[in-house]
Amino acid sequence: MESLTLQPIARVDGAINLPGSKSVSNRALLLAALACGKTVLTNLLDSDDVRHMLNALSALGINYTLSADRTRCDITGNGGALRAPGALELFLGNAGTAMRPLAAALCLGQNEIVLTGEPRMKERPIGHLVDSLRQGGANIDYLEQENYPPLRLRGGFTGGDIEVDGSVSSQFLTALLMTAPLAPEDTIIRVKGELVSKPYIDITLNLMKTFGVEIANHHYQQFVVKGGQQYHSPGRYLVEGDASSASYFLAAGAIKGGTVKVTGIGRKSMQGDIRFADVLEKMGATITWGDDFIACTRGELHAIDMDMNHIPDAAMTIATTALFAKGTTTLRNIYNWRVKETDRLFAMATELRKVGAEVEEGHDYIRITPPAKLQHADIGTYNDHRMAMCFSLVALSDTPVTILDPKCTAKTFPDYFEQLARMSTPA
């Protein structure tokens, strides 16, 4: 297996313009494909997840052109539901941001479509979304294991009264919200359970509004969506930088700054993960906000005990930042780490112990006490981009760290390690 050893880093300083947000890129691509008119998307993320979405749209007859660096996409919308040219199988890798929204949107058509992916995708639950789509008339079969992909879709979604479980993934609600305006009937979506990652729903609603569709949101417990609508292209749309990707650089600034400035997001950003900066501030770092930047300056870091439900992806970065904080850090209400690219709670606990931390792993929390001195270890990344990037921070100590399968960062940030090296002064 390929590996990358990062030597100790004495200081991190400088600015980075972030690649586009994965969450925003794939939502914008799907809405542009469903919309009337041509959309020019700029600062699109070039990553595995986005390539899977683009390949699927192409197979569904959507025409687009990409710039040489794949960050600009000119896409001609379908002016309504996506239609398969006959029976079709779409392979979506491990891209949850493609699988969930497409599973819903493709229930508006008539043809038979199979959605599948790599082995980990077949372990990521989708039953709650399928249950909701069936309530709206969709005809869906599980081809292997009940409640998991692969799925066979045969259209039939018309809207109506629908319940969705919000406790596992906000992507299920996102998928229903984006699909419902194109259904023939009005849709009322009721959310049961505590809605996880609520800020991701704000991203969805914000983008839908940009494409000309507004819906009634009653305290995130009920959404009323008029049927028979159309999305309309906004013309040009700039994808904001990925706030989850910003977390590694901001954390590096907190631990070993100088000052690190990330551009492409700021106080006006629609991504909930910008709140990560507030957590670093609570831990002792100094944060400066601009409209399109966030800067972080080193501080004396101390442990925190916090509910992280609102920033589940960026919260992983706090788990490795905790290695540099005084005291025991507890991250709570993070059950949905278990249904991501890997079981992130188990993975994080396992790898933190390798570098010497004392870790308590609960059903939905993790408690981390740093060692007096970090140990050099080979870090397993579980084919999870965030594990690789989180554990790069270990090199901000006086100990090297070896990252196994470093190229897994291609899911959201193909040149992550090059960018980190560019801003780092070796010890």
UniProtKB/Swiss-Prot annotation:
It comes from the Bacteria. GO terms for molecular function: 3-phosphoshikimate 1-carboxyvinyltransferase activity. The active site is at D313 (proton acceptor). Gene3D superfamilies: Enolpyruvate transferase domain. It catalyses: 3-phosphoshikimate + phosphoenolpyruvate = 5-O-(1-carboxyvinyl)-3-phosphoshikimate + phosphate. SUPFAM superfamilies: EPT/RTPC-like. Its main location: cytoplasm. Its EC number is 2.5.1.19. Pfam families: EPSP_synthase (PF00275). Keywords: Amino-acid biosynthesis, Aromatic amino acid biosynthesis, Cytoplasm, Transferase. PANTHER family: AROM/DEHYDROQUINATE SYNTHASE, PENTAFUNCTIONAL AROM POLYPEPTIDE. NCBIfam families: aroA (TIGR01356). Belongs to the EPSP synthase family. This is 3-phosphoshikimate 1-carboxyvinyltransferase. It comes from Salmonella newport (strain SL254).
